[in-house]
Design a protein with these regions (language model features):
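Hydrophobic transmembrane alpha-helices of multi-pass small-molecule transporters
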Residues: 14, 177-178, 245, 252-253, ...
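Membrane-embedded alpha-helical bundles of polytopic integral membrane proteins
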Residues: 1-207
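Juxtamembrane interface at the ends
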Residues: 145-146, 221-229
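Interfacial loop-to-transmembrane junctions
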Residues: 225-248
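C-terminal transmembrane helix pair
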Residues: 224, 249-257
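Juxtamembrane boundary at the C-terminal end of a transmembrane helix
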Residues: 258-265
Length: 265
């Protein structure tokens, strides 16, 4: 039954590939939906520790962010203004505390903003090819880390957060992502004659995804361990929730966007 659930979950996740291929407004629409669902999971998880995030503010910020066409300066003005407003909420309504204000903003930054980097990479020049680095980097890291850990794992990586992860698995994941992302660049360049940037950048992006996607996984695990839950939700049968499946991708997305924006330009 558990295996059947995982297959069902895989079928539910499969359309994401189609949206990646379509790109544009289709991918943006998917990212908005995933952001809202992920933020709901995050806020709901924190309620287990008796936090009371002001959820409506977080959802509003996500919608406003996309309506402003992902304008960073506009959304920062909105975040500062709404934080200013929310800081007054605990004064007039003792149901909320200043910590609730903090986790409300944290949820938007962690889930809403990080999800948006997938869309922001996609709308760059050659973005229809570059966006795959986010997913390939994350998926290969996860797969290579699993098998490397299974074959060679002896030293625990972060036992208090994720007891099953090993240092050897972590290294294997990073190496795997570096190689596969580099090969992806070579295939684009030599196989399809699509030149985007020097090949070494693909290897570097792969290495960075290999490192930071694992941090994304560990951050999500540490939150779950802190609030005492196994999965963020059971939205995807056999796979947990949106944040369970996209935790590493959130960190890869930021890394790929920042590297392309500030290093490659």
């Amino acid at each position: 039954v558990k295996l059947n659930k995982r297959y069902l979950g895989a079928v539910i996740l499969a359309p994401i590939i189609i949206f990646l291929l379509l790109g544009g407004v289709y991918l943006e629409g998917l990212i908005i939906i995933l952001s809202l669902l992920g933020l709901y999971e995050f806020y709901n998880a924190l309620k287990a520790k008796e936090f009371k995030p002001i959820s409506i503010i977080g959802y509003f910020l996500i919608i406003f962010y996309y309506l402003s066409e992902n304008n960073f300066s506009t959304i920062m003005y909105a975040v500062v203004f709404l934080t200013f407003i929310m800081l007054m909420v605990p004064v007039v309504n003792r149901k909320y505390t200043f910590l609730d204000v903090g986790v409300t903003i944290l949820g938007f930054l962690y889930v809403g903003m990080l999800f948006s980097f997938i869309h922001l990479v996609n709308i760059k020049e050659h973005g229809q090819y570059l966006v795959w680095l986010i997913f390939v980097g994350s998926w290969i890291t996860d797969t290579a880390a699993y098998y490397s850990g299974k074959l060679f794992g002896k030293h625990k990586l972060c036992p208090e957060v994720s007891p099953k992860k090993t240092l050897e698995g972590s290294i294997g994941g990073a190496v795997g992502a570096t190689i596969v992302c580099g090969l992806y660049g070579l295939v684009l360049n030599l196989g399809f004659n699509i030149y985007i940037m020097p090949i070494y950048n693909f290897f570097i992006i792969g290495a960075l995804c290999g490192i930071f996607s694992q941090f994304g996984d560990l951050v999500a695990s540490s939150v779950k361990r802190y609030v005492g839950i196994k999965d963020y939700s059971n939205l995807i049968p056999g796979h947990g929730g949106i944040l369970d499946r996209f935790d590493s991708i959130l960190f890869s997305g930021l890394i790929v966007f920042y590297y392309l924006t500030f290093i490659v330009r």
